[in-house]
Amino acid sequence: MFQAMGELDGADVKAVESATRERVAAQLASGEYTGWLVEIDGAPIAGAGVLLHQYHPTRQNPDGRPTAYILNVYTDPLHRRAGLATRLIETILAWCRERDIPRASLHTSEWGRPVYERLGFVPTHELRLELTNRVRTGSLP
């Protein structure tokens, strides 16, 4: 997935994949992360996940319920444009609604933006400051 998006290559991919496997395994065990896969004959062709974040209560979320961050949305190139990402996101949103999760957010590529906008996602005014300008390798925090 990281290579397909052009984010990492070579040794960086291996380091990030290893750290991701460890982190996701722990988050799956704790219930903090839930993932969905689409398979054909036992081989994954698409997937997505949701990571629950606990924030302090706010005006929009007065009881401080966890919010959902959707990530790891990926469809194998041979199976794109078949609506798999849309169905995965619809499944995740239904899962969130069943749990009374008040908000779902995500980051998207330009390719994915139309999918999310059709499902009702809107841009927000989030700001970000990168505190390091280097790609970390090895053990990631």
Please provide the spans of the model-predicted regions.
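Conserved GNAT-fold acetyl-CoA-binding loop/helix
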Residues: 2-24
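Conserved beta-strand in the GNAT
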Residues: 37, 43-52, 69, 74
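Conserved catalytic-core motifs of GNAT/GCN5-like acyltransferases
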Residues: 55-58, 105-107, 111, 117, ...
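Conserved acetyl-CoA binding element of GNAT-fold acetyltransferases
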Residues: 61-77, 129
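Conserved acetyl-CoA pyrophosphate-binding loop and the N-cap/start of the following alpha-helix
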Residues: 79-91
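Conserved GNAT acetyl-CoA-binding A-motif
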Residues: 89, 96-108
